[in-house]
Curated annotation (Swiss-Prot):
It is found in: Cytoplasm. PANTHER family: PHOSPHOCARRIER PROTEIN HPR, PHOSPHOCARRIER PROTEIN NPR. Keywords: Cytoplasm, Phosphotransferase system. GO terms for cellular component: cytoplasm. The active site is at residue 16. Belongs to the HPr family. Residues 2-90 form the HPr domain. Component of the phosphoenolpyruvate-dependent nitrogen-metabolic phosphotransferase system (nitrogen-metabolic PTS), that seems to be involved in regulating nitrogen metabolism. The phosphoryl group from phosphoenolpyruvate (PEP) is transferred to the phosphoryl carrier protein NPr by enzyme I-Ntr. Phospho-NPr then transfers it to EIIA-Ntr. Could function in the transcriptional regulation of sigma-54 dependent operons in conjunction with the NPr (PtsO) and EIIA-Ntr (PtsN) proteins. This is Phosphocarrier protein NPr. GO terms for biological process: phosphoenolpyruvate-dependent sugar phosphotransferase system.
Length: 90
């Protein structure tokens, strides 16, 4: 089963190196594949910092998060919490 949710980027600088690293590090704790899709359809695996940077998503943009795997629900909740916290940057 796959779980999905859309979130809005709330941190001032959007998806840049620091948030990408935080997300990458967070994903190491979960047995799940997590994909992020921006509003232009670009997809990035959450376990790839380079792919996350390619999302080129600024503050206010929508990101769809999709998780699949044994810990998909937990992984999705953790990613949503990180986005909602503005990656602890603000």
């Amino acid at each position: 089963m796959t779980v999905k949710q859309t979130v809005e980027i709330s941190n001032k600088l959007g998806m840049h190196a620091r948030p990408a690293m935080k997300l990458f590090e967070l994903m190491q704790n979960y047995d799940a594949e997590v994909l992020l899709r921006n509003d232009e359809g670009t997809v990035a695996e959450a376990n790839s910092v380079i792919a996350l940077l390619m999302l080129d998503s600024a503050k206010g943009r929508q990101i769809e998060i999709e998780a699949n795997g044994p810990q998909e629900v937990e992984a999705l909740a953790a990613v949503i919490a990180l986005f909602n916290a503005g990656f602890d940057e603000d």
